[in-house]
Every structure is written in C-alpha cells, then in structure tokens.
C-alpha cells in the first residue's frame, strides 16, 4: 500500500469517527497524524445538499460531525482553534453550518449554537447561492414544527438558544394529534410523501455493500417522524434493527430462542436475530435467484434478479464469498470490509469482503479473491472396524512352524519364556501376513488349533502359558474370548474318553514293530527330566506328591527298558496304572490326559 493510499485510509477513519461521535478514537487519530490534519478534507459519499442525488463530496471532519449531530466531536474541534468554521469545500460549496441545518439530526439545535458561538457566518452562501436557512427542508410533521422555528430564529441572528427557547415557551402551544398505527398487520400508519427520503431500491442504497453492512445498521439522523419502512437507516426501538456483522460475530442461522420471543444473550448471540439479520448476512445475501427475477416488486429483496447479480459461493460450505469483480465502497468506513464471508471467521485486513459485482470503485487497492482462500477439506471419518473382522485376522496367523517345533521335546524346554512364539513367528504377526477366512469352518478350526496349542504349552510350561495369555493380541477384542478354565474343562472331558483308551492300544501295538521302537528310543531320550538325564527310581513320597509326573516317567522308563529287549521274549510292562487314571475326576486327570496326548502325537510324528 502506497503512502497516498495509507494517508487516505487514515483520514477516512477520521471522518468515520466524526460521524459516529467517537471522541476517544478521533483524538487518538488526530494525535497520531498531527493536529494539522484536523482541518483537512477527504471524500465522503452521501446525499448532496438540497438534492436527492448521491455522490462523492469533499468534506472536513467538522462538516461530517455537524451533519450527523456529533456534539462532542464538534465541541472538541472548535476548542482546538485550528479550524476555519466558515470553510467551504466540495462541488456544492457547503459549510459546516449548511451541513448542520440540512442534517436534521436530534442535536441540530445544539450543533448550530456551537457553530454560531465559534464565529460561524449564518449569511454564507454555497455554490448555488443558498444560505444555511435556505437549505432547511420543510418539516412535514407538525410535531417538530416548533423546533424548526427555533432553528430559523437562531440563523436570523439570535444565537442565544435559551432566549429563543424562552420566546418559544411564551407562545401558545398548538395541540397536535398524533396518529398511532393500529396493531393489525394489514393496516399501518399513513405518512405524507417525503421527498427527502432516499430511494432504498436505487443508487447506493440498493448496492450489496450497503445492504449487507449499513442497511438498518446505521442510525437515522432525521429528527422528525417519517415512514421507517421507506428509510434504510435504523430508528430507536425498530424491530428491523440489525447488528453490524463486522463488529458482532454471528452467523446467518436463525436463533431458536429469538424465535420464541427473546434471546438472553442479546447482541453477543452467535445466531441471527430476525429475518433481516438472517437474509442480509454476507454469507447468504443474493446467493440465490429470485423466483420473480426482474419482475420482483419487493422494496428490499434478499435474492438476485439476474444471474450476473449472484454472489459466488464457497464450494465446501455453500456460503457467500467475495466477488473478484467487486471492490471497496467508500460509503462505509475504510476498515468496514476487513472481515470474511462469515462473521465468526475473521480474515486479514487485506482480504476483500463479500461484495457485489456492481460495487462502487474503491480508492484502496483490492484484496485477494476467493480463489486464494485455503480449501477446507472435511476430516476423514475414523470409524472403528468390525470386531469380528479384527478377531478373525488375529487368528489367521500360520502356526505351521510353531506346530512343527512342538514335535521335539527339546524345543519345548528351550522355548523363550518372554514370548509364546518364536522370533520368526512374531515377525509374521507384526508384519500382518494374513489370509482371508473363506468360511465359518475355517474360523472355528483356527480357533481350535490356537486353543489346542495354548493348552499343550500350558501343560509343558505353566509359566510360558501365562505369559502368552497376557500378551495375546486376540484376548481383548475377540468375539470368541472365553474363560480359560471353562475351555480346559470342556475339552478335557471330551478328549479324556477318546484318547486314554487309544493311548493304551497304540502303546501295545508299538511294541510289536522293531523299526519304530529303535527310532522312538532315540527321540525320547530327553523325556525323563529337564536336564536330559533319566531318573528311573521311584520313592514312596514322590509317588504320593507327584503321582502323575512320576507315573509318566515310569511309563517312559518302561518303554526304554522294553524296547531294546523285545526280541528276548521279556514280559510287557504293567499298564494297569492307566485304569484308575481314567476313572479319576476331570480336574485330577486333566494334565495327564494332555501329556498322554502330546506323547501320542510325538509317537505318530516319529512313525
């Protein structure tokens, strides 16, 4: 931004502070720019004196403050003594006194009095030869006729407001009947035609910028009664009042509490209060076509009448965005459009606001278009996967190597205590090498194999089995998770009857095959104890305390002693110890049955 544009922007802020009677902001700007800027002039968009036409006119801060009735700012400017009260500027050659009279604000009498006391000339003429008293518009309401007479007397030379008010009180009062509009919706109060009221459908009052940021937001400066529906400005107590979307962060969504009657949050509410705040919001105004198009007869229409009047939309949110063809409108403040398309989302001051394609040219450079705004991508949905699917995947691990490793008793004794699988098996588990389950039979088959593997390991090494259960990836989320004791009890009852008798029969048949006997002798050398040394002795106390393990040793020892002497005709070892084992309760025979089963599988593998 160049130096000229920056100075123009700051002076526009000075004029805006004068119009709003913001004395503190006005003082800070004057001190920042220097006191000499207080008598400067800048362009101001508004109605020309004595005419309904709108346009840019050169105005000073004193003239703008007098026009809008900013009493405190006028008093401060005059008190500095750095301004010329009778200075005229603009194409109409108006002075501050002309602006004060034509503004018809509520403080017009006090403003005129301050100017007259500050040596303002009531006989000064503008470019059309009109004195300040000549630009007073005829008051169409008799309510303010007395005030108009006071203003005329002040301009005729009597600058004492108290004296004029005393003369006015001495005059007989005129009884005036005030017509009150009935509460019926179809009927309303009739007002005479007011030529001073602007046309809210044409000119600057019909532009998108004015509709979104000034319509029913800026206060009306007229002190007489007039038709509020024909006036684009807001009046005290008017239901059509809007909050400025640049100052109050609210959306175009209607407030549910306001619909019921009143909203407890007031101006701080994040939702729109009323139809004007909803449909004149920058995010929604003229983003749709009017059904009547160019034949629309509404005084204030919220929709576009032509396709070229449509304001662009955000593809992701559907709300209005800045139009690349529109720019700044100087009928508002220079900082008026530093917000984005939706009020609660503030954007940098360099971003162009949502303006219309037919907006007025701006002395300030345009900003970024909506194409440069960052695209808002909706977040991807993080939905939890199927528990059944995750349970099946955890069971689809290939246990072929682990099952093969169980064929050797030495591998069982050397298995690491910290992991239920070998290192290669754990790598496959972490890598996620899965195969899809084709049927429920595969699923349940995998479950049986996995459970059987854990049961066998629990028999050989209880500590290893407990570690594997605590680190199992399936234990938490599997649909088939059950109590381990219930699984052991149910399966032990089923296999005990089938395996115990077949174990005895296979053992008897094994003794009649010398080739198998020699191979079995080599493979079962480590079955006696953990250190590999066979213990053939059986003590009485050991038989009572370790009945199952001792009997298993005796069983192994019997085979070791029988197999080498098969050809000598020695008698077979006594296996009557199995009979009481089969008749024992389920809890007592559980471990020996599984030990026998493992032993039989070892024999089958060797064979």
Swiss-Prot record:
Q: Which PROSITE patterns match?
A: ANK_REP_REGION (PS50297), ANK_REPEAT (PS50088), ZF_C3H1 (PS50103)
Key words of the record: ANK repeat, DNA-binding, Metal-binding, Repeat, Zinc, Zinc-finger
* Compositional bias per record (Polar residues), positions renumbered to this chain: 349-361
Stretches forming ANK repeats: 57-87, 92-124
Q: One Gene Ontology cellular component annotation? A: cytoplasmic stress granule
Which SUPFAM superfamilies does the record match to this protein?
Ankyrin repeat
Instruction: List the GO molecular function terms.
Output: DNA binding; DNA-binding transcription factor activity; RNA binding; zinc ion binding
Pfam families, alphabetically? Answer: Ank_2, zf-CCCH_4, zf-CCCH_AtC3H23
Q: Which residues form a coiled coil?
A: none
Region Disordered: which residues?
Answer: 161-193, 342-363
Q: Which GO terms describe its biological process?
A: regulation of DNA-templated transcription; translation
- Give a yes or no for keyword Repeat in this entry: yes
Q: Where is the composition biased (Acidic residues)?
A: 161-178
Q: Where are the zinc fingers (C3H1-type)?
A: 254-276, 284-308
Query: What protein is this chain from?
Result: Zinc finger CCCH domain-containing protein 66
Kindly list the organism's lineage: Eukaryota, Viridiplantae, Streptophyta, Embryophyta, Tracheophyta
